From Swiss-Prot:
Self-association and partners: Part of the 30S ribosomal subunit. Contacts proteins S4 and S8.
GO terms (BP aspect): translation
Domain remarks: The N-terminal domain interacts with the head of the 30S subunit; the C-terminal domain interacts with the body and contacts protein S4. The interaction surface between S4 and S5 is involved in control of translational fidelity.
Keyword tRNA-binding tagged: no
GO cellular component, one term: small ribosomal subunit
Record's protein name: Small ribosomal subunit protein uS5
Family according to the record: Belongs to the universal ribosomal protein uS5 family.
Taxonomy of the source species: Bacteria, Pseudomonadati, Pseudomonadota, Alphaproteobacteria, Hyphomicrobiales
GO molecular function, one term: structural constituent of ribosome
Classification via Pfam families: Ribosomal_S5, Ribosomal_S5_C
Length: 185
């Protein structure tokens, strides 16, 4: 016998409650038809669990709430996992680009906070990053900035993966990192 629909809805609400969503940009768009213009809205939303998973989505509808709902659902379908150092910052400096938009991101010491502008800040807040320094170059279009940020985040690698790629032990890589940090200070 089939389960009642209500239980399925409750499960979905519990699963959705673990995510934090941020509206990055809303745009009024117009479709020209025979009788004039038909207005609608396009929304860009970033969704994350603040534990290393994040996604973005784009939704279009005649009303703002419906566009935001569509964008949120789209974002939840395309989540990526980003490894974080100590659960608060990036493992290494990284850059990304999309179209004419470029971003540079650097790991930061505890207490630095999120030093990033506009759409990038929303991505970091939903991702769960607490300390990062980021700079956007080129295009300031929110769509390009978010896509460039995601391009950079996809390039982020855990030190264990880097060690495996180089064919060395993780402890050797960590020891090198320790000496590099000691010489900086």
């Amino acid at each position: 016998m089939a389960q009642p629909r209500r239980d399925d809805r409750r499960e979905r609400e519990e699963r959705d409650s673990e995510f934090v969503d941020k509206l990055v940009h809303i745009n009024r768009v117009a479709k020209v038809v025979k009788g004039g213009r038909r207005f609608g809205f396009a929304a860009l939303v970033v969704v994350g669990d603040q534990k290393g998973r994040v996604g973005f989505g784009h939704g279009k509808a005649r009303e703002v709430p419906e566009a935001i709902r569509k964008a949120t659902e789209s974002a939840k379908r395309d989540l990526i996992f980003v490894p974080l150092r100590e659960g608060r910052t990036l493992h290494h400096d990284v850059g990304g680009h999309h179209g004419a938009g470029r971003v540079l991101m650097r790991a930061a010491k505890p207490g630095t906070g999120i030093i990033a502008g506009g759409p990038m800040r929303a991505v970091f807040e939903t991702l769960g990053v607490q300390d990062v320094v980021a700079k956007s170059l080129g295009s300031s279009n929110p769509y390009n900035m978010v896509r460039a940020t995601f391009d950079a985040l996809k390039r982020q690698m855990h030190p264990k993966d880097i060690a495996a790629q180089r064919g060395i032990k993780y402890s050797t890589l960590q020891a090198r990192r320790g000496t590099a940090v000691a010489t900086e200070e």
